[in-house]
Amino acid sequence: MKITSVKNEKELVSFEIDLSEKKWNEFLDKEILKASKNLKMPGYRPGKVPLEIAKKNINMPVCFVNALSSARERIEDWIIDQDEFKKMADEICDFDPVTSKPNNSNNVLNKTVSFTMSFGKYPEFKVKNVKDIKIEKIESKVNKQMVDQAIEKELAKNETMSVKERAAKLNDIVIIDFKGYVDNVAFEGGEAKNYELKLGSKSFIDNFEEQLVGLKAGDKKDVNVTFPKDYHVANLKGKKAKFEVTVHVVNEVETPKLDDEFVKSLNLKNVNTVAEYKKHLEAELQKQLDGTVDNQIQSALYTELNKMVPSDLKIHEGLVNNVAEIFISRLMISLIGKVVNIDEFVKMIDGGRGALTKEKLIEEEKNQAREYLKVKFALKQYSKVEKISVSNEDIEKEIKEIAANSNTKEKEIKEDFAVYSSIKREALDKKVFEYLKNQVAKAAK
């Protein structure tokens, strides 16, 4: 096999590869041998028919097509290690070809075959000055209100209840049966038995809860309410309703007092007083907020990078398909733990409801792939503009992490040009994104 030409175009880098007659015959003979294994002919045992005789008695066009497929797969692996490819590697954004086709496949008698393989390139376009990337200001400092709300939640988690032989009050939890009617007809979803309801929680519509104040265990009452005009059930919007309610139990809720004894009961390390507890909460909330803010900045930056790609930029469909296939495989692994045929996957996930189709899934993942590629293109441009590169230490760190997680030797990763290059690209993308995020974060906080 040899590369006979390299064409560097706007969107693609294309390589023409010739297979020698000897190499092509290796692929073809292998397919002929497969096809002749079960060939029965007088004078020969099955699988022992000479190739030249077998060729006249098997479906040669099928063997030819299968040989082309095998040759194409082998070339896709082979080309990545060639010097001509490596020279162009930094311009190529995906090492899976967007097109891979034989040039002279119309004649099964051909003694040699050539292929053209095209790879998607990083497009060139202008990106904003980093200082001009603007995102909305984000609250990044924990305040007193946040701490107070966290304390209220913790106190509520430790509430206790006790049954009371008295009339219900706001903040009591009552256990009730209820059945609802609209125009004297019971409606779906309007009935429950032994339901726990905190009076004043506003979890029921209108003033339903307030109308139960004053009732005791054993009392019955018709509660009249009106459904909101924007209620989520269409046939109940704005309707007047009557609920037949029976009260079984009235529970008084006792909220613990925030004092040193309560704090000690939480068994927090080195936290024994209210003051220490508030400091502890503030620190924990700040950690959570830092994570939330970081995610918000990342999301906003992702959107901004996406917008920078010119709207008229054409992304090769083959490139989109390659990324979409990866996304679909990842989705399969995350949901069912393995990669299966896409039709089988859709059937498993949809369960026969018809909400998800193969076409819909592919289109959704292709849209995600386009968004992903746009960001990848923008990051590549910023790596040039800001002169950001990855050091050997950056790559070594990534390799060590991958080797540890995949039980693969570091040496094997380094010796595989495709894998090594992919790691290098991911490390660069990560470094550029972190740089941009840090710059944007200064203005956002």
Swiss-Prot record:
It catalyses: [protein]-peptidylproline (omega=180) = [protein]-peptidylproline (omega=0). Its main location: cytoplasm. Gene3D superfamilies: 3.10.50.40, Trigger factor ribosome-binding domain, Trigger factor, C-terminal domain. It comes from the Bacteria. Keywords: Cell cycle, Cell division, Chaperone, Cytoplasm, Isomerase, Rotamase. One of its GO terms (molecular function) is peptidyl-prolyl cis-trans isomerase activity. It is found in: Cytoplasm. GO terms for biological process: cell division; protein folding; protein transport. Its EC number is 5.2.1.8. GO terms for cellular component: cytoplasm. Pfam families: FKBP_C, Trigger_C, Trigger_N. Residues 171-256 form the PPIase FKBP-type domain. Consists of 3 domains; the N-terminus binds the ribosome, the middle domain has PPIase activity, while the C-terminus has intrinsic chaperone activity on its own. Belongs to the FKBP-type PPIase family. Tig subfamily. Involved in protein export. Acts as a chaperone by maintaining the newly synthesized protein in an open conformation. Functions as a peptidyl-prolyl cis-trans isomerase. This is Trigger factor. The gene is tig.
